[in-house]
Curated annotation (Swiss-Prot):
Similarity section: Belongs to the DMRL synthase family.
Organism field: Synechococcus sp. (strain CC9902)
One BP annotation, GO: riboflavin biosynthetic process
SS bond partners: none
UniProt gene name: ribH
Key words, A-Z: Riboflavin biosynthesis, Transferase
Annotated PANTHER family: 6,7-DIMETHYL-8-RIBITYLLUMAZINE SYNTHASE (PTHR21058:SF0), 6,7-DIMETHYL-8-RIBITYLLUMAZINE SYNTHASE DMRL SYNTHASE LUMAZINE SYNTHASE (PTHR21058)
InterPro entries (alphabetical): LS, LS/RS, LS/RS_sf
Function: Catalyzes the formation of 6,7-dimethyl-8-ribityllumazine by condensation of 5-amino-6-(D-ribitylamino)uracil with 3,4-dihydroxy-2-butanone 4-phosphate. This is the penultimate step in the biosynthesis of riboflavin.
Residues binding (2S)-2-hydroxy-3-oxobutyl phosphate: D90, T91, R132
GO CC term (a single one): cytosol
Listed name of the protein: 6,7-dimethyl-8-ribityllumazine synthase
Pathway noted in the entry: Cofactor biosynthesis; riboflavin biosynthesis; riboflavin from 2-hydroxy-3-oxobutyl phosphate and 5-amino-6-(D-ribitylamino)uracil: step 1/2
Length: 162
C-alpha cells in the first residue's frame, strides 16, 4: 500500500500563482498578506526577482476563473491560490457571483489537474469578512498552507506516476 501526503518540507520550491480580487480590497489585501506571510515562513522565496510567486489582480470574484485558467494553462505553476471576498447585499447578485466563481474555479482544477485553492470568503457582513481576514484568524494563511500541501502532494504523485 502506498500512502501519499503533502510535505511542507518539499514545498519551498513550488511555483505558486495567486489571483486576487480587487473588489473588497480591504479584505483581499489582508488575505494576501496572510498568504504571503505563510509562504515566507515555510521557506518559499516570495521576492519578485525569484519568480517563485506571481500575483495577478482582477476586478472582482467573477473574473477569478478566467485568469486562474490562463495561469494554469502556462504550466508554470504547481498550485494556484484564488483570493476574494463576496459579501451578501440586498440583491441576488451575491448568489450569482459566488456560484459562477466557484464553478469556474473548480472547472479549472478538473481541466488542468493543477490544484487551485478556493480562497474566496462568502459572508453576510463586512464584519464577518474582517474577522476571517484579521490578525487573530487570517484565512489567507490557511489558504497558503493548503496550497503548499496540495502542490507537494500532486508533485509527489506525478513523480510516482500515479
Amino acid at each position: 500500500m502506498t500512502v501519499f501526503e503533502g510535505n511542507f518540507e518539499n514545498s519551498k520550491d513550488l511555483n505558486i500563482g495567486i489571483v486576487v480580487s480587487r473588489f473588497n480590497d480591504l479584505i483581499t489585501n489582508k488575505l494576501l498578506s496572510g498568504c504571503i506571510d505563510c509562504l515566507k515562513r515555510h521557506g518559499v522565496n516570495v521576492e519578485t526577482n525569484e519568480n517563485k510567486v506571481d500575483i495577478a489582480w482582477v476586478p472582482g470574484a467573477y473574473e477569478l476563473p478566467l485568469i486562474t485558467q490562463l495561469m494554469a494553462r502556462t504550466k508554470k505553476y504547481d498550485v494556484i491560490i484564488t483570493l476574494g471576498a463576496v459579501i451578501r447585499g440586498d440583491t441576488p447578485h451575491f448568489d450569482v457571483v459566488i456560484s459562477e466563481a466557484s464553478k469556474g474555479i473548480a472547472s479549472v482544477t478538473r481541466d488542468t489537474s493543477i490544484p487551485i485553492i478556493f480562497g474566496v470568503l462568502t459572508t453576510d457582513t463586512m464584519q464577518q469578512a474582517l474577522e476571517r481576514a484579521g490578525i487573530k484568524n487570517n484565512l489567507g494563511w490557511g489558504y497558503a498552507l493548503q496550497a503548499l500541501e496540495m502542490g507537494s502532494l500532486v508533485n509527489a504523485m506525478k513523480i510516482s506516476k500515479v
